Amino acid sequence: SQKSFIYNINAGKLSQDHWVKDPKIGGGRIIGEICHFLDLLVFLTGEKIVNFSISSMDDSLEDCFIITLNFKDGSVACINYFSNGHPKVEKENLKIFTEGKYLEMNNFLKINGYGWKNFSKKTFFYQQKGHKECIHKFLHSVKNGLDSPVELDELIHVSELSIEINNALRK
């Protein structure tokens, strides 16, 4: 089913000499950070991104921008990536709207839901970003000769898209 996403990232300000901003080390904020948000959205939809647009604030090319995404199944997403927010506001907030239902994830610590049978909220004691689970699944697949838990074409799709978005921002 089609989904609508609003993904707010309160990224925080980085100095110009920060390693993330170095194209040779961190790749810049799109290559080094946005790729993860794209990957999550592709995972949640199960679909490839077929179109995007990007807009940035004139004076902060790589620190404050909005990316809109269209997915093959008609789902849409908006990634709001800002470094000009207050540091006490959560870094990541993802809102998902689908079939009269709503989910909201705050900083990978809390999930609230409306319209879901037998679910309304879940709170974690520490951030649950899936790193441990991903490593476990990868090692399990290698050990047992299974396919990769993430399809190669999905990894390539997100990587190529990250480069395309980065190039579009710099035009």
What residue ranges belong to the model's regions?
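Short, well-ordered secondary-structure micro-motifs
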Residues: Q16-H18, V89-E92, W116
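Predominantly a Rossmann-like dinucleotide-binding segment in NAD(P)-dependent oxidoreductases
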Residues: S1-S55
